[in-house]
A protein has these predicted regions:
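N-terminal anchoring/stem segment of glycosyltransferases
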Residues: 1-66, 83-86, 228-237
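A residue-level signal for conserved active-site and pocket-lining positions in enzyme catalytic cores
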Residues: 6, 27, 79, 96, ...
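A structural signal for well-ordered alpha-helical segments within the folded catalytic domains
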Residues: 18-21, 73, 77, 183-191
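Non-transmembrane alpha-helical segments in soluble domains
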Residues: 24, 28, 107, 169, ...
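A glycosyltransferase accessory/donor-loop signature
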Residues: 38, 143-145, 149, 155-260, ...
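GT-A fold catalytic core of metal-dependent nucleotide-sugar glycosyltransferases
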Residues: 71-127
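Conserved catalytic core of nucleotide-sugar-dependent glycosyltransferases
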Residues: 108-171
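Helical coiled-coil/dimerization "stalks"
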Residues: 292-307
């Protein structure tokens, strides 16, 4: 039995079973000896098992998570898994990701009693993606600093982390009923992990990254790549994943056999790309707010027509 656990979540839309299948297959090819867990519904479990019949995957089932908000915060339920006490270290990976090599190097880098994440963006960015309103509510004079992405979370199996996850989840659901959520779970992870000084935002930068080119991913020896953008749109995710995989075939015959190299500064880290990513996130937020307003107007019209 492995002392390491990797897990992901699959709820809300059936097309994400295809997205998760890509992640599972990439994990298998990596040669990892870690256990792999999918948190999903009974229906999606059966679909995933049919798509990945040879994968030795564990499952945690919950059948009443239906909305995007529930899907996004489900990653915090990991301590509900009955066998969780068996593991020393745990690694969450977003479903819309690929594992390019044995993630043991990722587990080895988890040394302190904090959550390891990938630092990105700035917490006071107007796009709200990194928790601007939460930080300013705490302190209107809050000093800007680097934010973080929750697409990968590495941590030890300790009570401190479990209690922190419970606190984040409680705050998330309270806000969901009282206010309009912006970018789902991401702002809450930023606020609680950074405010409580409970995260390492540097170590994973050389191991995991969002949307690198295949060439840069191989050159920098990345273990995990994430296909950020368009949350809830599985077709877009699959297009991004397939495009990346095609690029990998051109770049190298075998990802698993590619020797890792020390990460070096690349075009992904340049300010121009960072600004572009922030612009993308801002546009996504605006589109989501427009979608919500349209739904509210449609509901209002239906009520008026039924009067």
């Amino acid at each position: 039995m492995s002392k390491y656990l990797i897990y992901t979540c699959c709820f809300h839309q059936e097309i994400y079973t295809d997205v998760v299948s890509n992640l599972i297959n990439s994990f298998k090819k990596s040669g990892s000896t870690a256990d792999f867990l999918v948190y999903t519904t009974t229906q999606y479990k059966e679909i995933i098992q049919a798509k990945c019949p040879d994968a030795n995957v564990l499952f945690l089932e919950k059948n009443f998570y239906k909305t995007m908000n529930q899907a996004r915060i489900s990653k915090l339920d990991i301590f509900d898994y009955p066998g969780i006490e068996k593991y020393e270290k745990i690694l969450y990976v977003d479903a819309d990701s690929l594992i390019l090599k044995d993630p043991e190097c990722v587990f080895d880098s988890i040394q302190d009693d904090v959550v390891y994440v990938v630092g990105e963006g700035n917490i006071l960015n107007e796009g709200e993606y990194w928790g601007r309103s939460l930080f300013l509510k705490e302190n209107p004079e809050y000093t800007d600093r680097e934010g973080m992405s929750a697409f990968v979370l590495g941590f030890k199996n300790i009570q401190t982390i479990k209690k922190l996850f419970i606190k984040i989840k409680q705050s998330f659901y309270l806000d969901m009923y009282q206010n309009k959520l912006r970018f789902y779970d991401q702002p809450f992870f930023n606020f609680y992990l950074l405010q409580n000084k409970m995260c390492n935002t540097e170590t994973f930068k050389s191991l995991a990254r969002s949307r690198p080119t295949p060439e840069i991913a191989l050159k920098d020896g990345l273990a995990i790549v994430h296909f950020a953008g368009c949350p809830g749109h599985g077709n877009v995710k699959l297009e991004l994943i397939n495009e990346f995989k095609s690029g990998l075939v051109v770049a190298t015959p075998s990802v698993v056999d590619t020797p890792s190299v020390v990460a070096t500064p690349s075009v992904v880290d340049t300010p121009s790309v960072s600004v572009a990513n922030e612009t993308i996130f801002l546009l996504q937020q605006q589109l989501e707010e427009m979608r919500q307003k349209t739904a509210q107007l449609e509901e209002l019209l239906r009520k008026q027509l039924n009067q």
